Curated annotation (Swiss-Prot):
The gene is nfo. Zn(2+) 3 binds at H175, D222, H224. This is Probable endonuclease 4. Zn(2+) 1 binds at H66, H106, E140. The keyword RNA-binding does not apply. CDD domains: AP2Ec.
Amino acid sequence: MRVGAHVSIAGGVDNAVTNELDVGGNCGQIFTHSPQVWQDPNIGADEAAAFREGTAADLDGPWVIHSSYLVNLCTPKDDLRAKSIDSMQAEVDAAHTLGIPYVNVHLGAHTGAGVDDGLDNAASALDELDIPDDVTVLIESDAGSGTKLGGDFEHLHEVLTRSDQDLDVCIDTAHAFAAGYDLSTEAAVNDTLAAFDDVVGLDHLQYVHLNDSKHACGTNKDEHAHIGEGHIGEAGMRAFINHDAIADVPLVLETPHEDGRGFAWNIDRVRDLRA
């Protein structure tokens, strides 16, 4: 199975390969810069080459880049929209440089513009990107708090339909659970993945953020827990990981570092739960 974690690129993006190996991962996710500031990736040719070579030699892949937390594709504000588009263009260009096939992004919040206008804003913003042929933008499912979009699978479908780009999807299990899609039992997992297939299509599911949830289903609260130890729980996680629809989908963890346990413990847990 392909499972890894979101790892640091401190000291150079090529260090992500070693960091991934250190936690037992064989695929993974990175930020190309601090996600809390507007900043373009600064990746030198030598470190990009070392990253590509290290990935090819030591990992199964694929990697995914997580875009900045400041990006808001749904915004009605022209200045924020322009910054979001510029930031996303820099990310897809960095992905091409690094040989990373995916850039993951949250749709953002409509901040009062309304769901339909927010979805239109997101689709049209994505249409302004010049995405390299070897890179795909993944729309991430959201927990659905406030005016954030992406919590409803229909939101994902609408953006994929309204945009002229060739887009796919990343499901975050904690987000989907918080948004009201139950994953705590085998029956619930079957129902949720069937619902996703009906609305979006499992052919669009290219990556999973595998996280348990510290809060109950439908609370719209986004706080991750160790695998099998949150409200999704061991039974739900086992059912999800072993579902036929997930068998070949790469899994990346964004689980907490607490109680003396980090990514290595959680990756081992995932492998233990895989039948």
